[in-house]
């Protein structure tokens, strides 16, 4: 996932600004700018990796002179102690970026790992693990990517991706004395041939 859509770059920028990475009095006070270092991103638990490219992008956004590279790729099963990525360069730059990079990777790997547990639970059955739009605002692309890394499938990315009739749509038409069949007929009549109509 080295090519990100613009909203992911914007999310990284917002996270860097939120954490005030360029105004870190602790690092400025105790880590001279000339000190060079190496940071290893290591797994602390079993799971499935997701977000390593995002973590690398964070390091490079905070300090473009940092040399960060992935050792493992997204979708890889993890064991405690596995080296995931390495970053070399200014120790101050590494320290300023590490928490944001880890936050992204931990969240994404958590989603991938949880998804994979469900995928494994239904293996051999005629079932798929499919996600929803119930994502943290701004994180939808990354959340859905993480689901895929865990072996799950994406449903709708947004409202425009299909018709999904839910109980709220039926209740909204109750005053017109319309039932489920009527609402489905309305949806089918307005849907183009490329739009899937589903009922939850």
Predicted regions and their residues:
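Acidic/glycine-rich phosphate/pyrophosphate-binding loops and surrounding catalytic core
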Residues: 2-200
């Amino acid at each position: 996932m080295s090519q990100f859509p613009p909203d992911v770059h914007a999310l990284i920028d917002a996270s860097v600004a939120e954490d005030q990475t360029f105004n870190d009095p602790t690092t400025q006070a105790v880590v001279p700018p000339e000190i060079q270092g190496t940071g290893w991103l290591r797994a602390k638990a079993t799971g499935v990796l997701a977000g390593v490219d995002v973590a690398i992008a964070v390091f490079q956004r905070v300090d473009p002179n940092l040399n960060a590279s992935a050792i493992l790729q997204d979708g890889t099963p993890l064991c405690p102690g596995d080296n995931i990525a390495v970053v070399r360069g200014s120790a101050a730059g590494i320290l300023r970026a590490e928490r944001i990079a880890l936050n992204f990777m931990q969240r994404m790997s958590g989603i991938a790992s949880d998804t994979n547990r469900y995928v494994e639970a239904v293996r051999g059955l005629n079932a798929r693990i499919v996600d929803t739009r119930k994502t943290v605002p701004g994180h939808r692309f990354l959340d859905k990517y993480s689901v895929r890394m865990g072996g799950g499938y994406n449903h709708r990315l947004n409202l425009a991706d299909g018709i999904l009739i839910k109980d709220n749509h039926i209740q909204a038409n109750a005053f017109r004395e319309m039932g489920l069949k009527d609402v489905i007929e309305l949806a089918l009549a307005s849907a183009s041939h490329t739009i899937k109509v589903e009922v939850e």
